[in-house]
């Protein structure tokens, strides 16, 4: 008897026509692993470690219309700190890069490497250290500020 299981994952396209795949038990990619860059003609860029951090950021920006500049950033998602160097060409176009990487050793190391790759004229702002120093990533931060303990709905 053959056992057929349904398989599913949420997929996010990357810059090499591959897909970053996620579900509750799996984190991987189909085809080639790469960064994902979304250019919108803005002067500044937001840098994320993964797509769920980007989605959390989008929700945060939606919840904070009093900070309109949150919606005026181009996007770079590393999809893995191991390939952070691939972001050099894209990030070098910007005068300011807002980094929302994880507050852990790989995130800090990726930030250090990226800082060394960028032109001296590019300002790299460590937003994770400023905005959510007690959380590992943007998703954890968003969950924390929206928890019922803080008087908000989840």
Model feature map: region roles:
Residues 2-4:
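Short, small-residue-biased leader/transition segments that mark boundaries at the very start
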Residues 8-14:
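Short beta-strand scaffold segments in enzyme catalytic cores
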Residues 14-23:
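Catalytic donor nucleotide-activated moiety binding site of glycosyltransferases and closely related
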Residues 24-43:
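Glycine-/acidic-rich phosphate or pyrophosphate-binding loops and their flanking alpha/beta elements
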Residues 43, 59-154:
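TOPRIM fold recognition
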Residues 49-52, 103:
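Helix N-cap/beta->alpha junction signal
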Residues 56:
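Phosphate-binding glycine-rich loops and their immediate beta-loop-alpha structural context
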């Amino acid at each position: 008897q053959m056992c057929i299981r349904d398989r599913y994952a949420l997929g996010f396209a990357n810059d090499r026509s591959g897909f970053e795949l996620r579900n509750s038990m799996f984190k991987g990619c189909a085809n080639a692993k790469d960064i994902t860059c979304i250019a919108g003609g803005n002067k500044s860029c937001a840098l994320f470690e993964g797509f769920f951090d980007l989605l959390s950021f989008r929700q945060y920006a939606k919840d904070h219309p009093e900070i309109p500049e949150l919606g005026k950033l181009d996007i770079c998602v590393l999809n893995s700190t191991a390939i952070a160097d691939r972001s050099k060409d894209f990030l070098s176009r910007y005068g300011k890069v807002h980094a929302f990487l994880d507050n852990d050793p790989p995130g800090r190391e990726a930030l250090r490497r990226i800082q060394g790759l960028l032109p001296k004229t590019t300002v790299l702002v460590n937003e994770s250290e400023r905005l959510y120093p007690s959380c590992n990533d943007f998703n954890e931060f968003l969950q924390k500020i929206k928890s019922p303990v803080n008087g908000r709905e989840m």
